UniProtKB/Swiss-Prot annotation:
The lineage of its organism: Eukaryota, Metazoa, Ecdysozoa, Arthropoda, Hexapoda. The keyword Coiled coil does not apply. Keywords: Cuticle, Repeat. Residues 41-114 form the Chitin-binding type R&R domain. It comes from Blaberus craniifer. This is Cuticle protein 7. GO terms for molecular function: structural constituent of chitin-based larval cuticle.
Length: 145
């Protein structure tokens, strides 16, 4: 086959034999042994803060062992969450709301109360008599009004 290129060069398909690459071996570098290079672990950390002129804000930070994120409205109410790795290796997660009604939190690190409901308290005879006398006096006062 005779082939002519768009630029006017002509050649035969026999001259297009596949090129055979010779194997290449890389010699070890006499200067650096990659196995002997110590690489320090990288602790990537980031933080952010954005706020407008009326006080609304969003802010937080993240690194290898802890994170925090919060948003705040113009009235100062905040909603956020944070997490960290405890000394025991447990990931502690906390969500919170801070507003006019107080600080409200939910976390996997809070203690859990007992699941057994205690028996009701039974009044002693003296307490039962005092309650009855008190209620009798209350009814007498109500009758006068």
């Amino acid at each position: 086959d005779h082939i002519v290129s768009p630029h006017g060069f002509s050649y035969t398909s026999a001259s297009l034999s596949p090129y055979v690459y010779a194997p290449y071996t890389y010699a070890a570098s006499p200067y650096i042994n990659p196995a002997s290079v110590a690489v320090a672990p990288v602790n990537v950390a980031t933080s952010y803060h954005a706020q407008d002129v009326i006080g609304q804000a969003s802010y937080g930070h993240v690194d290898a062992y802890q994170a925090h994120h919060a948003v705040q409205d113009a009235a100062g109410n905040k909603v956020g969450s944070y997490s960290y790795v405890s000394p025991e290796g447990k990931v502690v997660k906390t969500n919170y709301v801070a507003d006019a009604t107080g600080f409200h939190v939910a976390s996997n690190a809070l203690p859990v109360g007992p699941t057994v409901v205690p028996a009701p308290v039974v009044d002693t005879p003296e307490v039962a008599a005092a309650k009855a006398a008190h209620l009798l006096e209350v009814e007498k006062v109500k009758g006068r009004v």
